[in-house]
């Protein structure tokens, strides 16, 4: 498209499937979320226990959060919110920015502003006039998600992955052939990635799981 119309960037973008166009917006939002989360973690502030200024949301039975029933943590409800987070009823949330974003306040809000700035999105209004369906008002996402039903067992030799085990470690690999080949099973809420949890278990490079 750009070969025929070198400056028609919007037209070129529209040649992508609608799902990929929307994914670009979601990716930008997630980048800001990740930077904000990193700022918070680097400060030593908990991502599980709320502090004043946080926005907390109820956790639904499917593990998702109800963003329509969020509450702002203040000095008057801090202890109650902390207790409900500890019991798994509420989750501390982070921002997925948009045209009408609901920001946290106090120090958690500062981390969100820093994250959006680090992502290079401070001047973005999230209103896509050329492709209105990509305009987003923004929402929030839980800073942490629970996992359930964890089981660990040694993988049998008949497992499909055993051939890879027999080949042994390749150059740059960080596992030992005399170790154990394990199978982990667990349940995550919809939208959570098993590979992310496995990275936390394994503490390995991205190409090792």
What residue ranges belong to the model's regions?
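Non-catalytic, substrate/partner-engaging modules appended to enzymatic cores
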Residues: 1-209
């Amino acid at each position: 498209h750009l070969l025929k119309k070198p400056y028609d960037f919007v037209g070129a973008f529209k040649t992508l499937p609608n799902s990929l166009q929307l994914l670009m917006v979601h990716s930008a939002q997630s980048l800001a979320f990740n930077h904000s989360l990193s700022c918070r973690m680097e400060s030593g502030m908990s991502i599980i226990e709320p502090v004043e200024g946080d926005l907390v949301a109820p956790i639904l039975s499917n593990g998702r959060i109800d963003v329509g029933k969020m509450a702002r943590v203040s000095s008057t409800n801090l202890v109650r919110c902390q207790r409900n987070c500890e019991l798994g009823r509420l989750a501390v949330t982070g921002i997925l920015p948009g045209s009408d974003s609901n920001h946290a306040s106090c120090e958690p809000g500062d981390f969100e502003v820093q994250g959006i700035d680090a992502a290079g999105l401070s001047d973005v209004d999230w209103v896509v006039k050329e492709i209105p369906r990509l305009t987003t008002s923004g929402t929030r996402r839980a800073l942490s998600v629970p996992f359930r039903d964890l089981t660990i067992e040694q993988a049998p030799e008949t497992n499909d992955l055993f051939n890879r085990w027999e080949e042994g470690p390749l150059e740059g690999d960080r596992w030992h052939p005399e170790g154990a080949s394990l199978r982990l099973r667990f349940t995550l809420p919809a939208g959570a990635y098993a590979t992310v949890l496995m990275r936390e278990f394994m503490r390995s490079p991205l190409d090792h799981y």
